Amino acid sequence: MPAKPVLYLIDGSSQMYRAFHAPVRTGEGSLLRNAQGLPTNAVYIFVTMLRKLLKEHAPQYIAASFDLPGRTFRDDLAADYKANRAPMPGDLAAQIPLVHRACEALGVPIVTQERYEADDVIGTLTVRALAKGFDVAIVTGDKDFFQLVDDRVRVFNPRDDGTWYDAVGVKEKFGVAPEQVVDVLALMGDTIDNVKGVPGIGEKGARDLISTHGTLDALLANAAQVPQKKYREALLNHADEARSSRELLRIHTDIAVDIDVATLNYRGPSREDCYRLFSEMGFRTLVNEYAPDARNTASDYALITTS
C-alpha cells in the first residue's frame, strides 16, 4: 500500500522570530547586514532552515503561514491579549517582506487569513489535509502545536536537533497526551501573550492536575476535592480565567481559508528570483549557486518529481 502524501506546514512567524534571535553576527558582533545596511540575519537563518528542509525531506506538498498585522479574533475575546509584548524590533520588521520573498522564490506558497493567526491557518489546513488523505508535518518550535498531534500529524522542530514529535514524543516532552495539551496550557497561562491562566499553577502543577483529572472541565468540576489547598483555592477562585485562557490558546481548525490543500504541491524554486533576492542580500554562496550560468545540481529542488 503506497504511503500517504505528506503536507509540510511551516509556522513561518515563529521560525522567523527564532531566526532573528539566533546568534548569527559579523566579526564585529553586530547583526548581519547587506551592503546597503539592511539587516539580513533572520532572512539568512530562515533560508538556511528552509533549504535544509527541502533538501533533506523532499516534501511533495508544502506551505508556510505568517501572522498578519492588525487585530485578530483573540483581541476581541480579551482586550489585553498580547498587551505585554514589546514592539517588534525594527530590524526584524524590516526583514518580514524579505522572508516572504524567500519563501516564494524557493517555491513555498504562503497562506494567511485576516483576523486569524498562523496557528489557526495551520490548524485548518491540517484538518483539511487529513480529510483528503494526507499526513501532516508541522514545522515549528512552538509547543502550542502539540495539541494538533495524532497518529497522522507530527511536529518537526528543526532547531531541536531536527526532532520529530508524535503522540508518544509529546507525552515524553510535555508530560501529557496531545488532546490534554491545551488544558495544561490553559492552567499555566502564557506570560508572553498575556494569557492569565490560573495564578499559582505552573507547568508541573498543571501537568499533574490534568494527568490526574483527565480534562480541564473535569478538574474544575471537582476543584473542591483537590487535596492541595493552594491549587484548590486557585481553581475555585479562577475557574473563569482557566476557561477563557483555554479559548485563547486553542488552535482553531475550521476557519475560512480559501485554499485547496491539493494545490499546495511543491514545484521547486525560481532560480531567477532566488538569484535576484540573494544578490540583494549579499549571500555570496547562494548567489553563486543560483547564478544564471550555474549548473543545475542535486540541490536544485525543482528537480523533485512525484509519482
List where the protein language model places each region.
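Charged, flexible boundary elements
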Residues: 111-121, 290-307
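Noncatalytic, basic helical substrate-engagement surface that gates or grips nucleic-acid strands
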Residues: 2-139, 143-168, 241-258, 263
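Non-catalytic nucleic-acid-binding/docking modules located in mid-to-C-terminal regions
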Residues: 1-4, 58-63, 150-154, 158, ...
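A generic structural signal for solvent-exposed, polar alpha-helical segments
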Residues: 23-26, 79, 87, 272, ...
